[in-house]
Amino acid sequence: MSEELTPQQVTRMTKLQKRLRTEVGRAIGDYNMIEEGDRVMCCLSGGKDSYAMLDILLNLQQRAPIKFEIVAVNLDQKQPGFPEDILPAYLDTLGVAYHILEKDTYSIVKDKIPEGKTTCSLCSRLRRGTLYGFAQKIGATKIALGHHRDDIIETMFLNMFFAGKMKAMPPKLLSDDGANMVIRPLAYAREKDIAEYAALKGFPIIPCNLCGSQENLKRAAVKEMLVQWDKQHPGRIETIFTAMQNTAPSQGVDREQFDFLSLQRDPDAPMSGQVAESDLPAFDFVDVSNNGHINLDAAARIDVVSTYTPE
């Protein structure tokens, strides 16, 4: 920690750690993220999220009923001004196994992306490829990334608004080649809790804008939208995330998710709730013809007064 905390701050930090530990533990259980004997490669960027993820995973490792190994890995992408000593010094204090990799993806990105454009997308793809390869080299069975609940929701709206897809970040993902399993232990955690916890813990944060890349304006706009919703409608973000876990393909319009083409009614199926006509209650009759005023006749019934069948 960078400075002494007050008793109130210590209490708050303990409460946040317990909350994050509970949420991470629940996510791990719900999605079977970590199993007996796993070697978990914990990817560190030097930001608040990955620091918090490592901290909570190390805490859970001491309490978990299963045995698993944690290996911290950072990729130095040779961005100008990257402080090479910060992460090794911090990791040494934890006593956790770690690797610092070096690969000049910065030069590749600057060569491919026009000046003034955001480089984050290409940078992350190059970083992901390097980390996937290293995970196989060290025999990692899981690759842990620090994306949290807000990242997942933001990604869903970004894909909805700008890509025409209902797609987010899954808590657990098998790579396209089937060789790597990616997990997101912070999937249930709120960013504001992580930020507050990181500040209280005094993690040595490394800025993410050393490359000089412009902020992703679309993501920033979606993030601000969600921040305002959270202020104006408490509980809405939680409801959105709950909805993401309760999809109903048969109630949507995606033909790939549900087989509408072969959907057929069963002519032999009994009518649902079939009762004798004499047992049917009277229906209220609604008349909206009187200048928009609604008149209810509680005694009125709906009767079939005539039918016509064309020959």
Curated annotation (Swiss-Prot):
InterPro entries: Rossmann-like_a/b/a_fold (IPR014729), TilS/TtcA_N (IPR011063), tRNA_Cyd_32_2_STrfase (IPR012089), tRNA_thiolation_TtcA_Ctu1 (IPR035107). Coiled coil: none annotated. Catalyzes the ATP-dependent 2-thiolation of cytidine in position 32 of tRNA, to form 2-thiocytidine (s(2)C32). The sulfur atoms are provided by the cysteine/cysteine desulfurase (IscS) system. This is tRNA-cytidine(32) 2-sulfurtransferase. The keyword Acyltransferase does not apply. It is found in: Cytoplasm. It comes from Shewanella pealeana (strain ATCC 700345 / ANG-SQ1). It holds the Pfam family ATP_bind_3. Belongs to the TtcA family. Homodimer. GO terms for biological process: tRNA thio-modification. The gene is ttcA. The lineage of its organism: Bacteria, Pseudomonadati, Pseudomonadota, Gammaproteobacteria, Alteromonadales. One of its GO terms (molecular function) is sulfurtransferase activity.
